[in-house]
UniProtKB/Swiss-Prot annotation:
The gene is atpF2. HAMAP family: ATP_synth_b_bprime. Its main location: membrane. This is ATP synthase subunit b 2. It comes from Methylorubrum extorquens (strain PA1). One of its GO terms (molecular function) is proton-transporting ATP synthase activity, rotational mechanism.
Amino acid sequence: MAEQKNPLTTPSPNADTTIVPAGSPHTHTEQPSGGHGGAFPPFESHTFLSQLIWLALAFGLLYYLMSKVALPRIEAILGNRAGRLSSDLTEAQRMKTEADAAGAAYEKSLREAQAKAQAIAQETRNSLSAEADAKRKTLEAELNQRLAASEATIRTRTTEAMGNVRAIAGETASAIVERLTGQAPDQASLNRALDATPAVH
């Protein structure tokens, strides 16, 4: 039967079995790992070159990815936005031009309508004035004719009345003379006496 070895007293085959006498200058005490005795690895000088190389590679890869993937997408987005803005500006300019043209056409139509209205009003005033003048002249001519006819009638009636008055006066004078003298006067003497009498107006 094989003898059992105590692991606490029997060294491991991989263990260093060199015995160092007490007080030897090679004697040292192991420090537990995890202490602050070593430097931070990124700050160790012998790793600077490799770190710079990896940093350059990382930046190069990042630049490549940005230039091939991200930047084209950003440029495409910016290009689409620029094209949309340009299209919107062009459309706005076109609409502004159309609005200006419509405003100018409206103002022109308004001016033409005002001119036509003024011309029609002036023509109407002229027509009414000419018609009024014609009516006034016609009325004046009619009134003048009536006035002339009235004056002629008055003169005729005055002449007739005066003739009647002369006849009445002659008859009256003849009756008076006959009453006073007992003899009727002759017609020639009576006419001379009537002619010598002033006419009463």
